[in-house]
UniProtKB/Swiss-Prot annotation:
The gene is Pdx1. Phosphorylated by the SAPK2 pathway at high intracellular glucose concentration. Phosphorylated by HIPK2 on Ser-268 upon glucose accumulation. This phosphorylation mediates subnuclear localization shifting. Phosphorylation by PASK may lead to translocation into the cytosol. This is Pancreas/duodenum homeobox protein 1. Residues 146-205 bind DNA. Residues 247-256 have a biased composition (Low complexity). It is found in: Nucleus; Cytoplasm, Cytosol. Activates insulin and somatostatin gene transcription. Key regulator of islet peptide hormone expression but also responsible for the development of the pancreas, most probably by determining maturation and differentiation of common pancreatic precursor cells in the developing gut. As part of a PDX1:PBX1b:MEIS2b complex in pancreatic acinar cells is involved in the transcriptional activation of the ELA1 enhancer; the complex binds to the enhancer B element and cooperates with the transcription factor 1 complex (PTF1) bound to the enhancer A element. Binds the DNA sequence 5'-CC[CT]TAATGGG-3'. Disulfide bonds: none annotated.
Length: 283
């Protein structure tokens, strides 16, 4: 009986693992119904080294953590069978460690979560950051590496591209592959270059059209003035209309009649200071 009493007294030092959980503890009865344990015999006495482990349990157990204690099992033998399925925990040299015994594991858990995120795309908000998340299986890209670098074309590459654009404003897929191999570029580089070059060409064409429309509107007035002057000179050079009888006055020269009178001369008959000769009378 001494060994059994020592065993029952030692179980009071054991702290239930549920005691380390935070929050209110529901009220429950520690005494199970007697029908569950009828016919069961009490466990055998512990081995001799159990006394040494009790001292270790008493020294290493955290003080005043559990909100309640297991009631003494000596008064109720049925409650002693609650822990008969945990013989290994009673024989441990140290008590079961709590989730955060000394407050040191909390900081250790928070620091890795700040450094290593479960998904790399959750850390960066810049564009094109997904390219470097699988490099080497680890996400160690700097913010500077996420920026897209501008492609620098050489003179030989630009010359070949300009020559191709001179003949074809839109490049086909086979020709694009051929140029990519010849110029040591990617198809994407050539495609983007042709897109930018077409936009530049369209802007130049629009500028030429707008400048041509402005110059054409200003120069269109001069031909109208020339036409007006020319038409006036032609009107002055034209001979006067013939009389209704069809007879042409004798004072009008033949050049005026044919319409070949110079512009400085008038087609109207000029009064002559010489008196007309009288017709000679027949003798």
């Amino acid at each position: 009986m001494n060994s059994e009493e020592q065993y029952y007294a030692a179980t009071q030092l054991y702290k239930d693992p549920c005691a380390f959980q935070r929050g209110p503890v529901p009220e429950f009865s520690a005494n199970p119904p007697a029908c569950l344990y009828m016919g069961r015999q009490p466990p055998p006495p512990p081995p001799p080294q159990f006394a040494g482990s009790l001292g270790t349990l008493e020294q290493g157990s955290p003080p005043d953590i559990s909100p309640y204690e297991v009631p003494p099992l000596a008064d109720d033998p049925a409650g002693a069978h609650l822990h008969h399925h945990l013989p290994a925990q009673l024989g441990l040299a140290h008590p079961p460690p709590g989730p955060f015994p000394n407050g040191t594991e909390t900081g250790g858990l928070e620091e890795p979560s700040r450094v290593h995120l479960p998904f790399p795309w959750m850390k960066s908000t810049k564009a094109h950051a997904w390219k470097s998340q699988w490099a080497g299986g680890a996400y160690a890209a700097e913010p500077e590496e996420n920026k897209r670098t501008r492609t620098a074309y050489t003179r030989a590459q630009l010359l070949e591209l300009e020559k191709e654009f001179l003949f074809n404003k839109y490049i086909s897929r086979p020709r694009r592959v051929e140029l990519a191999v010849m110029l040591n570029l990617t198809e994407r580089h050539i495609k983007i270059w042709f897109q930018n070059r077409r936009m530049k060409w369209k802007k130049e064409e629009d500028k030429k059209r707008s400048s041509g429309t402005t110059s054409g509107g200003g120069g269109g007035e001069e031909p109208e003035q020339d036409c007006a002057v020319t038409s006036g000179e032609e009107l002055l050079a034209l001979p006067p209309p013939p009389p209704p009888g069809g007879a042409v006055p004798s004072g009008v020269p033949a050049a005026a009649r044919e319409g070949r009178l110079p512009s400085g001369l008038s087609a109207s008959p000029q009064p002559s200071s010489i008196a007309p000769l009288r017709p000679q009378e027949p003798r």
